[in-house]
């Protein structure tokens, strides 16, 4: 393929499809982590392209915390059914039994037990040796230095000082029993690339990404959308309807909305052209402490 003849987006698309096919051919039991967000939607679209007209040769895995937005759950089930994907859903049973709650236990403990430990449980349960993730290098500084093939030891831990060289498009997937690789086909994409590709390919996304009047309250410098009744209002807090959308999606108590009037994809793309902040500014889990994302990844977070 002549790279000079491809547009920027088509080059990214070709690279991602190549990575996805390499993993499917090289590993015995891969899985695609499906978090329901825009990056997962693009990654799933690329995977379907990679194996068209056949079906995906691996399942989707959603590590459920029980606190995602209702629209995310509806979108997840609708998407899996529409594309005929095998969807595995895992929720940490110990965390459920303990009643882990982001309001009571805080973002760090909630994320560690329901997401990190939940993910490791699922990977061990099904014996996956490679797991696709939708992380991108432009999102956050620890992800910026992570390889496309990210080696994890038998405890699913990442050591940033023990990464393998990746020369051109040659990836080292050699692992011993119990070890695994996290694979990031979207590593070289930016948030702007993601939105332009979604528009170009007409990819379906969760409506929460588009601006609408939604019930929110201000807490800890964040606009929290109230998605159900599992919240106790603090003194002085008032729920108001405001025009907001989300740049990133996660557990609703830990994901801040942004004020916006962008109700269409072209309007989102235009908004991104002048944005000077990271999309993860609304993620409470990234504020736990300095270097919190790298610490989470060292412990097994995706």
Curated annotation (Swiss-Prot):
Superkingdom of origin: Bacteria
Keywords tagged on the record: ATP-binding, Nucleotide-binding, Nucleotidyltransferase, Transferase
One BP annotation, GO: sulfate assimilation
EC number: 2.7.7.4
Any matching Pfam family: PAPS_reduct
Pathway: Sulfur metabolism; hydrogen sulfide biosynthesis; sulfite from sulfate: step 1/3
Recorded catalytic activity of this chain's protein: sulfate + ATP + H(+) = adenosine 5'-phosphosulfate + diphosphate
Disulfide bond residue pairs: none
GO MF annotations in UniProt: ATP binding; sulfate adenylyltransferase (ATP) activity
Role according to the record: With CysN forms the ATP sulfurylase (ATPS) that catalyzes the adenylation of sulfate producing adenosine 5'-phosphosulfate (APS) and diphosphate, the first enzymatic step in sulfur assimilation pathway. APS synthesis involves the formation of a high-energy phosphoric-sulfuric acid anhydride bond driven by GTP hydrolysis by CysN coupled to ATP hydrolysis by CysD.
Family: Belongs to the PAPS reductase family. CysD subfamily.
Stated name of the protein: Sulfate adenylyltransferase subunit 2
Species per Swiss-Prot/TrEMBL record: Escherichia coli O139:H28 (strain E24377A / ETEC)
Classification of source organism: Bacteria, Pseudomonadati, Pseudomonadota, Gammaproteobacteria, Enterobacterales
Gene it is expressed from: cysD
């Amino acid at each position: 393929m002549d790279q000079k003849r491809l547009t920027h987006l088509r080059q990214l698309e070709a690279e991602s499809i190549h990575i996805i096919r390499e993993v499917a051919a090289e590993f015995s039991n891969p899985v695609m982590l499906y978090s329901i967000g825009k990056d997962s939607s693009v990654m799933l679209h690329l995977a379907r392209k990679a194996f068209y007209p056949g079906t995906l040769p691996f399942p989707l895995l959603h590590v459920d915390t029980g606190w995602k937005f209702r629209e995310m759950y509806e979108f997840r089930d609708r998407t899996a059914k529409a594309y005929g994907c095998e969807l595995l859903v895992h929720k940490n049973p110990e965390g459920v039994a303990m009643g882990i709650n982001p309001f009571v236990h805080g973002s760090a403990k909630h994320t560690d037990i329901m997401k990190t430990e939940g993910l490791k449980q699922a990977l061990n349960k099904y014996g996956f040796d490679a797991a696709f993730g939708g992380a991108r290098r432009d999102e956050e500084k620890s992800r910026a230095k992570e390889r496309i093939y990210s080696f994890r030891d038998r405890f699913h831990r990442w050591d940033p000082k023990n990464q393998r060289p990746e020369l051109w498009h040659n990836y080292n997937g050699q692992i011993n029993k119990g070890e695994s690789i996290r694979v990031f086909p979207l590593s070289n994409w930016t948030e702007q690339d993601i939105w332009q590709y979604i528009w170009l390919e007409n990819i379906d996304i969760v409506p929460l990404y588009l601006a609408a009047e939604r019930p929110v309250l201000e807490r800890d410098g964040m606009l929290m959308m109230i998605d159900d009744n599992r919240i106790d209002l603090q003194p002085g807090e008032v729920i108001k309807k405001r025009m907001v959308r989300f740049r990133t999606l996660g557990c609703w108590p830990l994901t801040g909305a942004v004020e916006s009037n962008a109700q269409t994809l072209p309007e989102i793309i235009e908004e991104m052209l002048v944005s000077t902040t990271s999309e993860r500014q609304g993620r409470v889990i990234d504020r736990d402490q300095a270097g919190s994302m790298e610490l989470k990844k060292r412990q097994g977070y995706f």
